[in-house]
Amino acid sequence: MKFLLKKALFISAISLAPAAFAVDMTGAGATFPYPIYAKWAEAFKAKTGSNLNYQSIGSSGGIKQIKAKTVDFGASDNPVKFDELEADGMVQFPAIIGGVVPVINVDGVKPGEIKLDGPTLADIFQGVISDWGDKRIAIMNPGVKIPSGPITVVVRAEGSGTTAIFTDYLAKTSTLFKDGVGAGANVKWPAASTVGGKGNEGVAANVTRVKNSVGYVEYAYAKKNKMTYINLKNKDGNFVAPDDLTFAAAAAGTDWSKIPGMGTFITNASGAKSWPITGASFILLYKNPENKANAAEVIKFFDFAFKDGKKMAEELDYVPMPDATTDFIRKNVFTKVMTK
């Protein structure tokens, strides 16, 4: 992990708008949505001249920074509970939907060739299954040549919303995992051979580097790095591959407007084509922000993303929020933020 350093990712582009109207916004948090936030920010800069400096430091870091009021908005894949939002004077809304995928580095195995269910995947990540030659893996993959070798588990080194989504799924499908490891942004991984990586990019780098390893990353990182992913058995009993269609299928049954604070996990969702480790990434804003001009620009940024950023999201295999949800956000969340 020595080469993985805490970094601030500065997003900029050539300004096509008058400098007098430009605003320098700041945000921090989840690495899960960083690829699409970068694309949206570039397009928003070209249209308005306003910059976004987004620190991709992990969901726990984003929550800490917004609570410390050092950024204009926080970003987290691990939704903040409604009571906590109320106590802190904040609002929360989902900005984008994506999928977390298990990725591996096993010689001779192609993407999607290995199929697993939730309990088996959970046993791998808690060290109950420690070799790729384990008969439980073989039984689920008849005809697939999987070479034996000790499994190295790659996890997030810091508090992470991606970890929260992933462990929420594992805990829902494995009682052993739920009771032994539990779900959360930062858990104690019991597997003897465990390696940490900073951010989704750090996990992707370590899985790529370490032979016979397995990790979990947001799908855009797996796709960008041409990683080998595992197909999973969903709640309906079907093996599915990760992509924007299976993520959308998983999210289809969620009525965000009826959830206090709009915060929920959508893992292990019903549906024939649902990807079981699907999640949303959330934005946190103060109702009465110290810098109201910047808060107004943040709202304009996400309104722009909702209206003009759908194609950009789909190109990276994210799922844009449905129109009904973004309309609800405009009327019931944005209006609670004081911008003057």
Task: List PLM regions with ranges.
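Sec/Tat signal peptide C-region and signal peptidase I cleavage site
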Residues: L16-A22
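Alpha-helical transmembrane segments
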Residues: F10, S15-L16
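Bacterial N-terminal signal peptides that target proteins for export
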Residues: M1-F10
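Flexible loop/hinge segments at secondary-structure junctions
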Residues: A22-K340
